[in-house]
């Protein structure tokens, strides 16, 4: 696994899904063990930041022998998000910290997956001693990256216009959260999905999951 060549001081594990399984001989346990090896490569002063809502990550933590903190929506998370609300492309939530007052976060990004990612950033910044107001300001100014819910523009059509969104989501779980974000942005609009499979092996291994997900869409 190429990510074992990375040697960060802080490592965030957002989730562990069955992906790139050819690398792990089709063995999910081998994939999990590789993540554990990656975390054990952290220096003694390093930190693992773990999304506690993911059951695989939660189980992995019980075997981890490095300093770690957790984040998520669960009440026992060290850094917890609640009061999540989305209006259009913006998302607001409260980020609760182990010590001190919660931080009000206003993101220029839609979707609960971006809340999770922002909460991980809050946890890291807080551990590094960044002031809460600077954390909030920095996250509010972040507008995302290319091909991650990227608005390509509006196309005129017979009954008005169509918003075109490009997203690199290529795993069923990623596609699902992207579609959820789109529905939350435009709850009263039709959703038309154009999906391009990526990698033969991924499409083969996750074919049934892709079919189930995309078949649930009306168009």
Predicted regions and their residues:
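Short glycine-centered, acidic/aromatic-flanked micro-motifs in structured strand/loop junctions
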Residues: 107-109, 166, 195-197
């Amino acid at each position: 696994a190429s990510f074992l060549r990375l040697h960060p001081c802080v490592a965030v594990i957002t989730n562990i899904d069955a992906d790139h399984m050819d690398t792990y001989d089709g063995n999910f346990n081998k994939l999990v063990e590789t993540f554990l090896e990656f975390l054990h490569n952290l220096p003694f002063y390093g930190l693992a930041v773990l999304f506690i809502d993911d059951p695989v990550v939660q189980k992995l933590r019980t075997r981890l022998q490095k300093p770690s903190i957790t984040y998520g929506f669960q009440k026992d998370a060290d850094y917890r998000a609640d009061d999540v609300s989305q209006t259009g492309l913006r998302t607001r939530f409260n980020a609760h910290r182990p010590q001190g007052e919660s931080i009000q976060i206003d993101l220029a990004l839609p979707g609960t997956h971006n809340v999770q990612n922002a909460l991980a950033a809050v946890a890291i910044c807080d551990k590094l001693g960044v002031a809460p107001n600077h954390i909030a300001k920095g996250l509010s100014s972040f507008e995302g990256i290319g091909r991650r819910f990227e608005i390509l523009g509006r196309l005129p059509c017979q009954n008005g216009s169509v918003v075109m969104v490009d997203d690199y989501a290529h795993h069923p779980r990623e596609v699902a959260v992207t579609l959820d974000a789109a529905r939350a942005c435009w709850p009263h609009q039709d959703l038309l999905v154009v999906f391009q499979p990526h990698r033969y092996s991924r499409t083969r291994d996750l074919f049934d999951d892709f079919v189930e997900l995309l078949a649930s869409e009306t168009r």
